Regions:
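Short alpha-helical segments that sit at the start of domains
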Residues: 1-13, 87, 91, 121-129
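Short, cationic-aromatic polyanion-contact patches
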Residues: 3-6, 22, 56-78
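Basic amphipathic alpha-helical segments that dock to polyanions
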Residues: 10, 40-48
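Short helix-capping/hinge SLiMs at alpha-helix to coil transitions
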Residues: 14-19
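Short acidic, hydrophobic short linear motifs in intrinsically disordered regions
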Residues: 20-29
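Short coil turns linking two alpha-helices in DNA-binding domains
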Residues: 33-34, 38
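A short, conserved structural fragment
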Residues: 46-58
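Amphipathic alpha-helical dimerization/coiled-coil segments
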Residues: 75-126
Length: 130
């Protein structure tokens, strides 16, 4: 499934929020977003079932739908990530990719937690492959 850069931006905004957002709230997150741009992207994302209406809220005197990402969107984004890695794995090796992913985590405690999860995952995978 193809997601254009603008739709991906909208998904990132929704994933970074701890609550479902209205179109107006999404527009207010970035200066380069307009109501019409966001509404167009929202329609496409809804049709593709990558987002869903997660509630209704008043925005002034108007009822507005609140949108949030679906599990399907997580799967599509993950597949896009894997496809990108496949395209570049001859240039960026496994070790470099993992180191890079760990380095972008600024919270040292979270990084340690991620390393522990990775060690556990690798141990399980090694055990299952034997």
């Amino acid at each position: 499934m193809k997601i254009n850069p603008r739709e991906l931006d909208i998904l990132k905004i929704l994933y970074s929020s701890d609550q479902a957002l209205t179109v107006t709230q999404i527009v207010n997150t970035r200066e380069d977003l307009t109501q019409s741009i966001v509404q167009t992207a929202i329609r496409k994302l809804l049709a593709a079932e990558l987002i869903e209406v997660q509630g209704i809220a008043y925005s002034g005197n108007v009822l507005s739908r609140r949108f949030g990402p679906t599990e399907k969107s997580r799967e599509v984004i993950f597949q896009r990530f894997l496809d990108s890695y496949r395209d570049y794995k001859c240039i960026i090796g496994f070790r470099t990719a993992v180191e890079g992913m760990l380095e972008i985590e600024e919270d040292k405690a979270k990084r340690v937690e991620d390393i522990e999860v990775l060690v556990k995952l690798l141990t399980e995978m090694k055990t299952n492959d034997q």
